[in-house]
Amino acid sequence: MYSMMMETDLHSPGVQPPNNTGQGGGNKASQDRVKRPMNAFMVWSRGQRRKMAQENPKMHNSEISKRLGAEWKVMSEAEKRPFIDEAKRLRALHMKEHPDYKYRPRRKTKTLLKKDKYSLAGGLLHAAGGGHMGVGLSPGGGGGGCGGAGGMVVQRMESPGSGASTGGYAHMNGWANGAYPGSVAAAAAAAMMQEAQLAYSQQQQQHPGSGGHHPHHHPHHPHHHPHHHPHHNPTSHPTPPQPMHRYDMSALQYSPLPGAQTYMSASPSSYGALSYSSSQQQHQGSPSSAAVAAAAAAASSGALGVLGSLVKSEPSVSPPVSGGGSHNRPPCPGDLREMISMYLPGGGEAGDPAAAAAAAAAAAAATSRLHSLPQHYQGTGTGITSTMPLTHI
């Protein structure tokens, strides 16, 4: 069988050189596209491909090539020798006909351009994302001294703000550029928008320069509070503990986007009650009583608008409280009783006996709840759970 194939293959290249010479003797356009000389495998596979295609007319050309390559690999050197010699003769003939021939690969440049195009798009996306975060955080100082619960956010904020804005963004998301799957791309875009919003709130809070004015920005960016307050308390008003915990009623479950939506939906309605709540809060001397008042009002009325107004109209300078710790101060039942009696719908003033009785019952339930929970972070833990049972009043 191999002798027959060798005969056909050895005779067919004898017909090929006139074709090549005729092609070379044609017009100049055909001379520009000169094919390379066949190697030994091509010399052998040309006849074999024709034969296999006739035997299997439905077989694809790629499958034929796979089978031919597998057969060529298992052939011995003695069986390949005549085809190797024929390939050498064809190469010598090709060099004689085209002495100045130089192989110029054309498809390789196209694939390289395609890869460069994709890498360029990924680089532009990388630079745009990192540059946006760097611009958003550079006025805010990159979140300087945040600590505690906001450690991960601080790490995300400091890497763009410290000058590595274009280099550190891929490490924030955890994905390389251009490598997002379909569903992950939406999540990454949402995370990018959320971090940009964090950066904007950071810039707005740092820009006025006064630590006491920062509550005016919080109703618009509520998901920033737990990470931002630990470095505001020691600088502007170190002794009162409650301004740090006053905003945590809306963020019952701290998921950044839903908490922000519920709080932002409640904050526009809060401006109507601004004057009344501000006058009521000016009469109260202790910031802890204002915080408890906010919790009781939100729980008893069932609306977050009063809480939003209290947050909006918090006085910028709070009176110092002697010996108050930042996190571990126990709740004050007397203040809670007074403020609940003020905000109850039945009477409003502390002198009303019915309101006083209801306030005493509510305060007892609240204090029992408060003392049953760990005291280590009262703003988010006890401030939420203590006011939830008051809704039945």
Swiss-Prot record:
Matching SMART domains: HMG (SM00398)
UniProt xrefs under InterPro entries: HMG_box_dom, HMG_box_dom_sf, SOX_fam, SRY-related_HMG-box_TF-like
Basic residues composition-biased segments: 213-234
Entry domain remark: The 9aaTAD motif is a transactivation domain present in a large number of yeast and animal transcription factors.
Region (Disordered): 1-34, 197-247, 315-334, 374-393
Induction: By bmp-antagonism.
Source species taxonomy: Eukaryota, Metazoa, Chordata, Craniata, Vertebrata
Keywords noted in UniProt: Activator, Developmental protein, DNA-binding, Nucleus, Transcription, Transcription regulation
One cellular-component annotation, GO: nucleus
Principal location: nucleus
Database matches in Gene3D superfamilies: High mobility group box domain
Organism, scientific name: Xenopus laevis (African clawed frog)
Protein name (record): Transcription factor Sox-1
Gene Ontology annotations of biological process type: brain development; negative regulation of transcription by RNA polymerase II; nervous system development; neuron differentiation; positive regulation of transcription by RNA polymerase II
Bias (Low complexity) ranges: 197-208
